[in-house]
């Protein structure tokens, strides 16, 4: 999965997919009442990027729905996965469950079209704080209460705080999650970060009894870093330059080893070599 980083304006969906991304990451900010409000990152952000692009969250969802609904004039068949980077740092811990409920209602209405031929991409809810694990239950309970438990088949989870792998496993246990787990590791492109924890996550994924299904590394903008990440066995790389990642995947060392994921590749099933 080539994951376009910080895609917060509707026009950027096409821009990143046309550069080679089959997945995008979108920031979600919340108001004081835990309503998802804007697709907005803010300052500071990655070097070389504008931090200030935004849409109202519900408007973005409608644009995303158009891009991921077969038959729509705006349909992008390559776009199969969307990571919502949930900026829950602005919320009190006791608002996490409420944020999950409201997120579920927004997605159900504006993205999934109340279960009636809505957007078809897989969704990953990425949460920065392990203490906010109740967001997951708020989300899953709400979809069930609204009569759409089948949509949970399209939803996965990520804790993005670079916490110890064992601590992340405990948070999932508390949240009642087993499966559909992506594990992120990374840092802004302005700084360097080694691959120690990525390798630990990959080992958990491949152990047969770990909690992780897929591992992604962020933010990867350079060819050398891309090669290191692919060599470490990641499933996804998040990038500001999808074309750079696509180029590396076409190099002789990689073109027979890795390929771009398609809709038929489940993002919840651990790939067995």
From Swiss-Prot:
Cofactor note: Binds 1 Mg(2+) ion per subunit.
A GO molecular-function annotation: metal ion binding
Gene Ontology CC: extracellular region
EC number: 4.6.1.-
Names of the cofactor(s): Mg(2+)
Disulphide connectivity of cysteines: 45-51, 47-190
Top EC category: lyase
Localization per record: Secreted
InterPro entries: PLC-like_Pdiesterase_TIM-brl (IPR017946)
Gene Ontology biological process terms, A to Z: killing of cells of another organism; lipid catabolic process
Reactions catalysed: an N-(acyl)-sphingosylphosphocholine = an N-(acyl)-sphingosyl-1,3-cyclic phosphate + choline; an N-(acyl)-sphingosylphosphoethanolamine = an N-(acyl)-sphingosyl-1,3-cyclic phosphate + ethanolamine; a 1-acyl-sn-glycero-3-phosphocholine = a 1-acyl-sn-glycero-2,3-cyclic phosphate + choline; a 1-acyl-sn-glycero-3-phosphoethanolamine = a 1-acyl-sn-glycero-2,3-cyclic phosphate + ethanolamine
Active site: 5, 41
UniProt protein name: Dermonecrotic toxin LhSicTox-alphaIA2avi
Annotated organism of origin: Loxosceles hirsuta
